[in-house]
Amino acid sequence: MNNLFATQRVFNADISSWDVSNVTTMSNMFIYCDVFNQPLNDWDVSNVTDMSFMFTYAYAFNQPLDNWDVSNVVYMQWMFVDASAFNQDISMWDVSNSIAMGRMFQGARTFNQDISSWNVSKVFDLGYMFLNASSFNQDINEWDVSNVEFMAGTFWGATAFNQPLNNWDVSKVKNFSYAFKSATAFNQPLNSWDVSNVTNMSSMFFYASSFNQDISSWDVSTVTQMVRMFYNANTFNQDISSWNVSSVEDMNLMLDNSDFSISNYDVALINWSQQAVQPEVKLGALGINYCDGADARQNLIDTHGWVITDAGLDCSTASVEDQNQLNITIYPNPSSDRVYIEGNYSQLKVVVYDILGKQVINESITNSIDISQLEKGVYILQLSDGAKLTTERILKN
């Protein structure tokens, strides 16, 4: 029955009594059947293996399918693409033999049914599955996605979706590009995800305007593409300086118009400049200023040929973080041997970094730091009394 009623835009006959028990493929069966909306729930589809594109662009279709035995269906990709009226309970479907669900509910704008019990353990493709499925907001945290390799665009435009996903085993996924693009409600922890096999994170959180979760522990060492990763993710402000970005070839527009603070941008520049990064990488941070990361930024440009677009140097205004900084005075600066610190404290923890982000001093002090053994140059001091933290720059001459 492949393509049987394809493009029959006015077809709307009652075919509910058909004996389809020997049919093995229903691919494209009702594609572009604009007005079709007839009962099909009595069909015996137990021998069907391919339902891909079955109701694609069947804009009016919204009939129960809960009686269907889909246990032999292997291909479900594009099944309900732009079936914009469809919102039926298919929670009991046995999809355990399906391997492909890419774009299954793309544009199914009213679909919002509980499919939490689905066994998707054989599926390798969930790409664009809920693209523009703007009503979908169901808990699918217990899905076994351990064999999925492709999750590009999975929740792109799923504007209502904000459910936990931290239990997902994504260790085989290679492509997360556009995964949460324009998923404007999504703000759930993803810190447990093993992304060590991912190579593409381009546009992953593009316009994900609510997302602001700690993903500092992610192993991104195999990622080569981070273009537009947080573009216009205008609440995202997390420390990702610990990321190993040595494989990344393109960060163009990566942080543009995000909510990245000066301090988070600084520490990212400092730590990344210490890595064996790729040459001539474009890093976009439009709207974001730097201060203490100035030397590290210049090192990335001069040594590695990076092209960095940001809002420039700004050490003049206090950031939100600065409101909790220590009230101290450091002198002399520059200094050749010892730097003294005055302020209302009893003891300070001090960590000193060189311009490449390498830690050169880590100790507790009472009133001074011995820098006599350091090479000449600019150093960054992080000082903490246990409650407040401040960052200062000194020059060793």
Describe the predicted segments one by one.
Residues Q323-N397:
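C-terminal outer-membrane/trafficking sorting elements
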Residues N2-T317:
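Negatively charged
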